[in-house]
């Protein structure tokens, strides 16, 4: 049987999460996102007007629109400002190639890789070489970072249940 958390357990878990990872966990819980779906969110995937998120190539390669809790809007705006600071710094680096885009899109809109909207909402802390083309890019946060934090926080709270990202 799957692990189910009570509302008070979820509240305690989310509040005890490390601050820099809390929004990820809140989005997973509140919008029903899977681990890689939340990791791959881009700035342009957020629709503040309709309070929804766009998930591209989710499980089974499907696209879907999910609800966005209005309580998360201030935190999301802060996160976008955080991404913008990385973006501005990255664009000053002549070797920076932008984010990786789907092949057809990269051919059709070569400048899109350096537009803010295509950048990950939860970026890695450092630039790295793309294994496909060797270009200098900023990838998304490593998923194991969130997985370890969720498990560690659940252990710290002594919930007595095996809690993973999938539980959220």
Model feature map: region roles:
Residues 1-168:
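Conserved catalytic core of the tyrosine transesterase superfamily
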């Amino acid at each position: 049987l799957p692990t189910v958390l009570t509302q008070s357990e979820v509240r305690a878990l989310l509040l005890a999460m490390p601050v820099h990872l809390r929004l990820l966990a809140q989005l997973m819980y509140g919008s029903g996102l899977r681990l890689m779906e939340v990791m791959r969110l881009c700035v342009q995937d957020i629709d503040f007007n309709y309070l929804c998120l766009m998930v591209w190539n989710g499980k089974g390669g499907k696209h879907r629109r999910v609800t966005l809790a209005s309580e998360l809007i201030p935190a999301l705006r802060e996160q976008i400002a955080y991404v913008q600071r990385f973006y501005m710094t990255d664009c000053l680096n002549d070797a920076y190639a932008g984010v990786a885009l789907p092949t057809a899109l990269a051919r059709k809109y070569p400048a899109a890789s350096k537009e803010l909207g295509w950048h990950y909402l939860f970026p890695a802390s450092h630039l790295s070489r793309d294994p496909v083309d060797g270009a200098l890019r900023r990838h998304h946060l490593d998923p194991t970072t969130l997985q370890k934090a969720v498990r560690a926080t659940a252990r710290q709270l002594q919930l007595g249940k095996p809690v993973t990202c999938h539980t959220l």
